[in-house]
């Protein structure tokens, strides 16, 4: 399968992983101070459609970029021959040197947003590994 199709499928997987993490896991009272939800249900419905479309488009772009990068760099991974484990290794390496260090470093100085940074830390790890697993399975 081409990396473009694999990237689009990985983007859909990342979108659903992101939805589960932010819609079902990180919903406690400590997170309520970081989001602005309109007060009425009708206004919430109006806001949700554009927000979900934007999130979906960004997830597709993310999947394409991840698949393209994986296609070009998979030969340098510890897991040789591709596959789901290679995709997850690639995704975790990207996550570790970018998002993990950024959120840990920001948490040192911005202590009031530490709950949001922790949520970002874990949600991106899940999102990256879901997309990496899909890309590793589909790109040969």
Residue ranges, per PLM feature:
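Juxtamembrane/disordered regions of integral membrane proteins
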Residues: 1-140
């Amino acid at each position: 399968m081409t990396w473009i199709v694999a990237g689009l499928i990985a983007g859909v997987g990342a979108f659903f992983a992101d939805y589960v993490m932010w819609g079902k896991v990180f919903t406690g009272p400590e997170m309520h101070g970081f989001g602005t939800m309109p007060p009425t249900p009708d206004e919430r419905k109006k806001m949700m459609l554009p927000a979900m479309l934007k999130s979906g488009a960004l997830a597709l772009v993310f999947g394409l970029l991840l698949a393209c990068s994986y296609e070009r760099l998979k030969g340098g991974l510890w897991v040789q021959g591709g596959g789901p484990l290679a995709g997850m290794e690639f995704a975790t390496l990207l996550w570790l040197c970018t998002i993990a260090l950024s959120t840990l470093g920001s948490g040192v100085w911005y202590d009031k947003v530490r709950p949001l940074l922790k949520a970002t830390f874990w949600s991106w790890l899940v999102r990256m590994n879901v997309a990496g697993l899909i890309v590793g399975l589909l790109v040969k």
